[in-house]
Amino acid sequence: MQITRIDDAQRYDAPKHFDMRSLRLQGFSASKADFAWVGLSHFLPGGGAEMDSGPLGKIYVVLEGEVTVDLATGETHVLHALDSCFIAAGEARAIRNASNAVASMLVVMPYPPKASP
């Protein structure tokens, strides 16, 4: 078993994100998890991620606050604490914190090809 204490979690930069800080909780350099990695993202008010899609699916779990997910189809969904969603590979989405409080969420993703530990 490998434990990552929050005080030991390492920061990483997520491309196309703004006014947000991320910590690696599992996978990559945080642990030997071989099937997925887990990040903790803290979005400041007004923070978010640009509309983008990726080659891998991802799961979001909101821990605190609210996160608005805008899809390229025009759909908008507001996720609250303990709400979760699955974004399929190739599905474009934007994320934003439209509130005046910090929003925190877990991100769970498989490794890109040849990137597993």
Model-found features: residue ranges?
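A short, N-terminal "cap"/entry segment at the start of jelly-roll beta-barrel domains
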Residues: M1-F35, E50, S116-P117
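Short, charged/polar surface micro-motifs in flexible loops or helix N-caps
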Residues: S31-D34, F43-G48, E64-V67, Y111-A115
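Glycine- and acidic-residue-biased ligand/ion/polar-headgroup-sensing regions
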Residues: P55-V67
